[in-house]
Curated annotation (Swiss-Prot):
Functional summary from the UniProt entry: Catalyzes the reversible phosphorylytic cleavage of uridine and thymidine to uracil and ribose-phosphate or thymine and deoxyribose-1-phosphate. The produced molecules are then utilized as carbon and energy sources or in the rescue of pyrimidine bases for nucleotide synthesis. Required for normal lifespan.
Pfam families, A to Z: PNP_UDP_1
UniProt source species: Caenorhabditis elegans
EC number: 2.4.2.2
Protein name in the entry: Uridine and thymidine phosphorylase
Tissue: Expressed in hypodermis, pharynx, spermatheca and gonad.
Amino acid sequence: MNGLVKNGNVEKPNKYFDIKDKRDFLYHFGFGVDTLDIPAVFGDTKFVCTGGSPGRFKLYAEWFAKEANIPCSENLSRSDRFVIYKTGPVCWINHGMGTPSLSIMLVESFKLMHHAGVKNPTFIRLGTSGGVGVPPGTVVVSTEAMNAELGDTYVQIIAGKRIERPTQLDAALREALCEVGKEKSIPVETGKTMCADDFYEGQMRLDGYFCDYEEEDKYAFLRKLNALGVRNIEMESTCFASFTCRAGFQSAIVCVTLLNRMDGDQVQIAKEQYIEYEERPFRLVTAYIRKQTGI
């Protein structure tokens, strides 16, 4: 199951993939190699930017196209599961919420890059998160991803067996993104990101329908996370870090905090402030991309 990137090309770690390569259909994207000229459409891709919301990523693609003065494609996905927009060398693909949805998107994105003949794509996740001891509006560039058991692995159950895989992220890319953040006066911190399995109990919220723990249990857990170097909580980081590492792709996770979980559970900020916070990961990442590509 393990594979490496060789000679800068996207290589397939699945030995059975070649059998169906010529007729491969990316089901959740709604197109395949015999229904779309994938190399013509995606062959110049250098960056794949991904995040949860389809609406947000449509906006991100449109904003980037306007800023860079380049065309923005229509939604290239032919499925209602995900959206795909392309602006020059950048693909914008949403992944939904949680690791199951993300894992589907990543596998089909990796296959898409293979079919397109792309060399050395960089994957960046842009998202929102809950802060752990950092103020709202802080952009956390993750050093590593931690699972709900507080281990630095992504856990998969395959054929009834527990498989653990590393959750490494690219240090050079992280440092470069942080440098751009300083240049743009965007509040940036680095630290670990905890990947919860759900939004409510898994993140020790007190405002869900179920709650079998006490308020002090919540704060004790958050203090423990903070002491371990965790700076934010979301629901995708372990899968994202593990899959991109396993595939041999440079990757980063850039998430803005919408609240400090030490102060509460609900996002209670004005709409204008919320929008400005959501723009911060976009501003940081696109400034880096434009610096790298010259567009």
